[in-house]
């Protein structure tokens, strides 16, 4: 499993960067929101697939089912390759890319990467530690905690689907600000000193709704902020910064939670979300001047 995880991760990262760049260049913001909405559908469906495998077969049967689904997707992509062809002007523009090193030297890119890192760090922390928060802080059973934690995924999935209908009217920047305001309201609900877990459950739904607009809008705004010729390289680095944040920051929260208390979750989340909106706003201001 460890050996196969390496090429699996390489392939997933390549698809993530390439697909996001393609949609950012050739489609509207609403399409980007709906694309990432179906990521949420996958996160909701996947536990049922593994649950079916564990109940009726073995755990590795779940991996086979997912592998078969991905093989079908790969075949569909190969069959529909002619549909993905772009016009020559766009092809020439993409060939002029400055590359990874050159992209890092563009004004505003370091701020963008820091903001994206902070967002993915906070989002993944909320995803992975919500159930533990309910158990350790609210004192409910692990089974019920897992159910309440899934509300975050529902919030982010529904939010991205709904935002697709309004994002073209408001624009990427306003959607990012709106999403940040919503998720901060959700975090404020976690600060309310109530023993009832219903408010905490509602808080994670609100945080998910707020997160819904941020990831797709940051990516979709990249070609407009830095130029289509640079978007491929920049979005690739964005994905790398996203993976760094989602890989290392949630375990850090686990260490802090065990050492101090899992009650620090709202403080932890608000730190990274404030860092995210600060860096993102700096990016938009710098690129607006340029």
PLM region spans:
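C-terminal transmembrane helical hairpin of 12-TM major facilitator-type secondary transporters
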Residues: 170-218
